[in-house]
Amino acid sequence: MTNGNGTPPEAAAPPQLNVLAQYTKDLSFENPNAPASLAPQQSQPAINIQINVGANNLAENEFEVTLSIEGKAESGSTVLFSFELAYAGVFRIVNVPQENLHPLIMIECPRLLFPFAREIIASAVRDGGFPPLMLDPVDFVGLYRQNLERAQQQGQPS
């Protein structure tokens, strides 16, 4: 069966993911012990990073996805620096089956946002007087699965 122009119906409307906007929602960098924290350290600081993804349905086929990244660098009990970034994008997603929509929003959209968020953090840390912090790539599939498991254990919908 064809749709009148010789193509099968499923080929008539390919899935589409468009980035409509990207923006910093919130950015905070703290260097609470400067200038002492800028002195050379005896050892590598311990760096703790937390990453979360959130999404809101703005309109039919349009979603805001927010990538939240928080981090802290400590040397012993001294905080060298800390940061928080909420970086978001508005995405238009059409012709995607409903069962694939949630994973697409929570995996692929943050994967597209991450390089930009990484650069913002690297620049903020550098501008704070430290070497740029280059975040390692994030396994958004693993993060998605982890969040699904946590939601199921708590009896919440994903």
Curated annotation (Swiss-Prot):
- Gene Ontology terms, cellular component aspect? cytoplasm
Which SUPFAM superfamilies does the annotation name? SecB-like
GO BP annotations listed = protein folding; protein tetramerization; protein transport
Record's InterPro entries?
A: SecB, SecB-like_sf
Localization terms from the record: Cytoplasm
Q: Does the keyword Oxidoreductase apply?
A: no
Please name the Pfam families in this protein's record: SecB
Task: Give the keywords, sorted.
Answer: Chaperone, Cytoplasm, Protein transport, Translocation, Transport
* One MF annotation (Gene Ontology) recorded for this entry: unfolded protein binding
> Do you know which NCBIfam families this protein is assigned to?
PRK05751.1-3 (NF004392), secB (TIGR00809)
What job does the chain carry out? One of the proteins required for the normal export of preproteins out of the cell cytoplasm. It is a molecular chaperone that binds to a subset of precursor proteins, maintaining them in a translocation-competent state. It also specifically binds to its receptor SecA.
Q: Which family does it belong to?
A: Belongs to the SecB family.
Quaternary state and interactors: Homotetramer, a dimer of dimers. One homotetramer interacts with 1 SecA dimer.
Q: What is this protein called?
A: Protein-export protein SecB
Gene name, per UniProt, is: secB
